[in-house]
Design a protein with these regions (language model features):
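A cross-family phosphate/adenosyl-ligand binding-site feature
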Residues: 1-173
Length: 173
């Protein structure tokens, strides 16, 4: 998705969770090469300069069940979730592309959280015609077919196709 976004003229800033980095769920060197920027996963230190420009729009992919529930509840205990809470408060276009199983989807908090985020103006690409949960234990088989392009198209529609974007790559929080 990062390469496709850059090809469309986006200035892409990748934000990963520390759990995603530690678990090997993101290929940091590949993302840095594709975006031309350092992947960020933590708050900057006091006195440290900002490394990324402010975003004009945000894509959250892949959004986990844990993160959708934290985000909807206003929990900002990671750098990525803090940026997402702020993006909603700033009224930025935000597109979220989930990734979780039907077992996790069956929990009432998950659907409630999707509704909360939609009520806040987040375009959650969830349900028929968008992304749908996979069978438990088959997540690894779904990775190659994950619809990254769906998120990029939705962002183009939501933002008018111009600006900067921070992509939150959040598969493990």
């Amino acid at each position: 998705m990062v390469e496709a976004a850059v090809a469309e003229g986006w200035d892409v800033c990748v934000i990963a969770t520390t759990a995603a980095e530690a678990g090997g769920f993101v290929d940091v060197p590949a993302l840095e090469a594709a975006s031309g920027r350092s992947v960020r996963s933590g708050w900057r230190r006091v006195g440290e300069e900002k490394r990324n420009p402010p975003p004009d729009a945000v894509i959250v992919a892949s959004l986990t069940m844990n993160s959708v529930n934290k985000w909807a509840a206003g929990i900002a205990d990671t750098y990525a979730l803090g940026l997402l809470a702020e993006a909603v408060g700033l009224g930025l276009p935000v597109v979220a592309l989930p990734f979780w199983s039907t077992a996790l989807d069956a929990h009432p908090a998950t659907r409630r959280s999707v509704r909360v985020l939609r009520d806040l103006g987040v375009r959650v690409l969830y349900g028929p015609g968008a992304w749908e949960p996979h069978a438990p234990g088959t997540g690894g088989e779904q990775v190659d077919g994950y619809p990254w392009g769906l998120a990029l198209r939705a962002m183009g529609e939501a933002s008018g196709g111009v600006g900067r974007r921070c992509v939150s790559h959040d598969p493990t929080t």
